[in-house]
From Swiss-Prot:
Domain TrmE-type G: 216-378
Chain's role: Exhibits a very high intrinsic GTPase hydrolysis rate. Involved in the addition of a carboxymethylaminomethyl (cmnm) group at the wobble position (U34) of certain tRNAs, forming tRNA-cmnm(5)s(2)U34.
Main location per the UniProt record: cytoplasm
Native organism: Stutzerimonas stutzeri (strain A1501) (Pseudomonas stutzeri)
Record's protein name: tRNA modification GTPase MnmE
Binding site for GTP: 226-231, 245-251, 270-273, 335-338
């Protein structure tokens, strides 16, 4: 356990009023503070009900006091929890009393950071705490719990252990070249390397599903005024989220709705109609729409199928493609298909341009759109996803896979054992970034600073 230099405290419950509020303390002064506030020696891991006293003996609040001696606590240090009434004033008084007794206010994520530094959990498990708090669906919450319990870390450790054993074998073959047997050419190394790559591919696929359930994707609905953009937003949201009228330019700002499609979070953004206008407010709305288009994972370009104008995105709005750097991210939505009598169908041309005919008002074609959005993000409802993952985890897994692929080429094409050994080392280092075995202080600072205060 890393010795703590000071004692920290923070409110561990969400801001606002509630039935119960918790002040958490961690560090070497936790036990002394428990005695001072309650007037008695706390029994480890037992709940004590009683008053919490101010310096002059006045009762600040009454509630439960729990003391967890280190190293058998969340942070690995002595931890004190004060469970009082959930009013912000009362909690602030309790927190200030702790500060007066020699503690300092905790930074965001500092409790979890101390748990990580004291080997109570690894980096992936620490991130799972934040993922569980922020989960937007039941499946995402279940995945976060599995990661918190170590499922993701266990898979990464298994891969790392296989890499270590393979490195030992390869480096031994390099260090003893006088042996008559060419250990690099006997097929054992190649078989083991292929096995690790196969397992890594499986973990990467599951991590991709976990990341989708955690982050979802951002879908921007864009198009000319009166094309039916707001009607499409309402249809996807299942409620009247946006005002719908026959007046062009009704939507002048960006509207956001968060929905779920088979457990996958979808962040839908409705935008102002794209057109040249002299109205200053509407012009600002168009600029915000173009900004949202540039940041989208997927763009639904809505056109009025009953209008005679072209369905080519560049013809509908000349600047559109300038703000959408990847044309492949655009799905053309031919809305009001009920007026044209065209089939409700999804088509893809030779250039990969997807076009979907639907009717937002009646809901015809919406299920096709939902399936299309899941397909665009590679989400499979039936695919196994047993843990939560973040984009940095995917980047690390892909980097490890790239090193293993390169190492495979070095072995099979050049027989270069030294270069293979280096690629194995780099792959192991990439995996270590996930659990924190190889992590810079800058990375740790960025991760834990995004946590809630008190976590």
């Amino acid at each position: 356990m890393i010795p703590a230099r000071d004692t920290i405290a923070a409110v561990a419950t969400a801001p606002g009023r509630g039935g119960v509020g918790i002040v958490r303390v961690s560090g070497p002064r936790a036990r002394a503070i428990a005695i001072t506030l309650s007037g008695r020696e706390p029994t480890p891991r037992h709940a004590h009900y009683g008053p919490f006293h101010a310096d002059d003996g006045e009762v600040i609040d009454e509630g439960l006091l729990l003391f967890f001696p280190g190293p058998h606590s969340f942070t690995g240090e002595d931890v004190l929890e004060l469970h009082g009434h959930g009013g912000p004033v009362v909690l602030d008084m309790l927190l200030q009393r702790c500060v007066d007794l020699g503690v300092r206010l905790a930074r965001p994520g500092e409790f979890s950071e101390r748990a990580f530094l004291n080997d109570k959990l690894d980096l992936a498990q620490a991130e799972a705490i934040a993922d569980l708090i922020e989960a937007s669906s039941a499946q995402a919450a279940r995945n976060a719990v599995r990661s918190l319990q170590g499922e993701f870390s266990r898979r990464v450790h298994q891969l790392t252990e296989r890499l270590i054993q393979l490195r030992i074998y390869v480096e031994a073959a390099i260090d003893f070249p006088e042996e008559e047997i060419d250990f690099l050419a006997d097929g054992h190394v190649l078989a083991q390397l292929d096995g690790v790559r196969t397992e890594l591919s499986t973990v990467l696929r599951e991590a991709g599903q976990g990341a989708l359930l955690r982050d979802g994707m951002t879908v921007v609905i864009a198009g000319r005024p009166n094309a039916g953009k707001s009607s499409l937003l309402n249809a996807l949201a299942g409620r009247e989220a946006a005002i719908v009228t026959d007046i062009a330019g009704t939507t002048r700002d960006v509207l956001r709705e968060h929905i779920l499609i088979d457990g996958m979070p979808l962040h839908v953004v409705d935008t102002a109609g794209l057109r040249d206008t002299e109205d200053q407010v509407e012009r600002i709305g168009v600029q915000r729409a173009l900004s949202a288009i540039g940041e989208a994972d997927r763009i639904l370009l809505v056109v009025d199928a009953s209008a005679p104008e072209a369905s080519d995105p560049s013809a509908l709005w000349p600047e559109f493609l300038d703000f959408s750097p990847e044309p492949g991210k655009v799905t053309l939505i031919r809305n009001k298909a009920d007026l044209t009598g065209e089939a409700i169908v999804l088509r893809c041309d030779n250039d990969g341009q997807a076009t979907l005919s639907l009717c937002a008002r009646s809901g015809e074609g919406l299920e096709l759109l939902r399936e299309h959005l899941k397909h665009c993000m590679g989400y499979e409802q039936t695919a196994e996803s047993s843990f939560s993952a973040r984009r940095r985890h995917l980047d690390a897994l892909r980097l490890a896979d790239e090193h293993l692929r390169h190492g495979h080429d070095q072995l099979t094409l050049a027989g270069a054992g030294e270069l293979l050994a280096e690629d194995l080392r780099l792959a192991q280092q990439a995996l270590g970034e996930i659990t924190g075995a190889f992590s810079s202080d800058d990375l740790l600072g960025r991760i834990f600073s995004s946590f809630c205060i008190g976590k």
